[in-house]
């Protein structure tokens, strides 16, 4: 198994409820290292650019408004099979379908306010990391 990096967002519903530390602990307990992290307030333009792949979907506007409603925490996670491991720790997109002990099962409010985002493939991880971090900010 190879050491990988993946991208994670702790979303507004979770930061608003002060869950950042508990969510970060779940990543670390799963063997993922946080090699970059920052709390930011997205602008509408940034949210629209980041989620541009969804621009034609009916939920795009609502998603962007949600993502600018409160600060978010963007992170780069590193570890063996980090992308798969992160997705396992997050749980299913719909918290009703998420396994016990996962972030979404424990903390998500709904399918829309599901507390976290994680990259789904090496290519998207690289793009998403580069959107928020310079190489100098990645320490590990």
Curated annotation (Swiss-Prot):
Keyword Kinase: yes
The entry's keywords: ATP-binding, Cytoplasm, Kinase, Magnesium, Metal-binding, Nucleotide metabolism, Nucleotide-binding, Phosphoprotein, Transferase
PROSITE patterns reported in the protein's UniProt record: NDPK, NDPK_LIKE
Active-site residues, as the UniProt record annotates them: 117
Top-level EC class: transferase
UniProt function note: Major role in the synthesis of nucleoside triphosphates other than ATP. The ATP gamma phosphate is transferred to the NDP beta phosphate via a ping-pong mechanism, using a phosphorylated active-site intermediate.
Protein name, as recorded: Nucleoside diphosphate kinase
Organism name: Jannaschia sp. (strain CCS1)
Lineage start: Bacteria, Pseudomonadati, Pseudomonadota, Alphaproteobacteria, Rhodobacterales
